A protein has these predicted regions:
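Class I SAM-dependent methyltransferase Rossmann-like catalytic core
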Residues: 12-72
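Class I SAM-dependent methyltransferase SAM/SAH-binding core
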Residues: 83-146
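A short acidic, Gly/Pro-enriched loop at the edge of an enzyme's catalytic core
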Residues: 145-162
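A short SAM/SAH-binding and catalytic strip from SAM-dependent methyltransferases
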Residues: 159-175
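A short glycine-rich, Lys/Arg-flanked "PGG" loop and its adjoining helix->strand segment in the class I
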Residues: 175-190
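Conserved class I S-adenosyl-L-methionine
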Residues: 190-222
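Short alpha-helix
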Residues: 229-252
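Conserved Class I S-adenosyl-L-methionine
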Residues: 254-335
Length: 335
């Protein structure tokens, strides 16, 4: 069983928290938000040298990748077409690429040109797949960017499976963006969404701690409201979520929605890793090191809130961890 850390245990190792925060200050001080994010996110991507898990810093991909494969099996036939939104550099897609039938076209939207180039390079190594279109643009700008570049987007009603894997944090209007994504689907097509529940997850609680201690994200009220909105729209219906189905029905793109909660976590080899990981979400845009100070305070003084513990078995034995649950949702267009 994992070793749970309560307030008393946290106080008993108070010097470790102090040292961890000092190390984080030393590493991140003087870095702009982009480089801060790069260093923090690197903790998530740490490879397992023994290949037992996909990455050491989280089990989120380990949990959702099999679900993506199941969505492929039930949604994509030979010569089908998938659309990967906010696609990244192809590392996540690589986990499921071999499950796609021969002749599948892959269309890609990704705002980072370097990531897009890496994705395209990977796609060339998969002879059973074909490139549909590739657009270097944020999803909110997808239609305008396609028109400006001359790139032809997939037609509405043409996509078998769309992927929105941990990318909905970066859209400005969640209901409008999901509606646009579903419009691409053919009847029976699926939009597969993965998003963290930050109402109870570590990064969301770190944001709240930052704000409660007087921190300013530039728009505190909005950043807190979008966390609640994601839960209302995409969370489990039994927990007051699933409202996206009503939104899509009103927009003329009705769906059947299947949502599952996965009790995923974030992991660090030490407390400094966990403090740094607080900056991989909405706090990424904040340059002040105060965000790390309030995350350290949260871990030390409210360890139960983030389910702080030390793993004592499996490939992450000896690592510290905190809760970071995710929702996996399949939205199947009905007409």
């Amino acid at each position: 069983m994992p070793i749970q850390i309560d307030r008393n245990k946290a106080e008993s190792v108070a010097p470790q928290f102090d040292e961890a925060l000092e190390l984080v200050r030393n590493e991140f001080g003087g870095l702009d938000p982009h480089r801060q994010y790069r260093n923090a996110f690197a903790r998530l991507l740490k490879p397992d040298p023994l290949g037992r898990v996909l990455m050491m810093g989280t089990d989120q991909r380990d949990m959702f990748a099999p679900e993506v494969r199941r969505a492929i099996e039930t949604s994509v036939l030979s010569d089908g077409h998938i659309f990967d939104f906010g696609a990244g550099d192809g590392q996540t897609f690589a986990l499921v690429a071999d499950a796609l039938p021969r002749g599948t076209r892959v269309s890609i939207e990704e705002p980072n040109p370097e990531y897009l180039a890496n994705y395209l390079a990977f796609l060339k190594t998969k002879p059973h797949l074909r490139l549909g279109m590739a657009l270097a643009a944020a999803f909110d700008e997808i239609d305008a960017a396609a028109e400006l570049s001359g790139e032809k987007l997939p037609s509405d009603g043409s996509i078998d499976l769309s992927l929105a894997l941990h990318m909905l944090y970066f859209v400005n209007d969640l209901p409008a963006s999901v509606t646009r994504m579903v419009r691409f689907l053919k009847p029976g097509g699926v939009l597969f969404v993965v998003v963290t529940d930050e109402t109870v997850g570590y990064t969301g609680l770190a944001l709240k701690s930052f704000i409660e201690h007087g921190g300013d994200t530039g728009d505190n009220a909005r950043h807190l409201s979008v966390i609640a909105e994601r839960r209302r729209l995409l969370g489990l219906p039994a927990e007051g979520g699933g409202a996206i189905a009503e939104v899509l029905g009103a927009a003329g793109t009705p769906v059947e929605i299947d949502v599952r909660r996965q009790q995923s976590r974030l992991y660090g080899h030490n407390l400094a890793d966990l403090i740094a990981l607080s900056a991989i979400a909405l706090l990424a845009s904040v340059e002040s090191l105060e965000k790390f100070e309030t995350a350290a305070w949260l871990l030390r003084h409210s360890p139960e809130a983030v389910d702080l513990r030390i793993e004592d078995d499996g490939p992450r034995k000896g690592m510290w961890s905190v809760t970071q649950p995710q929702w996996v949702a399949a939205l199947r267009r009905t007409r």
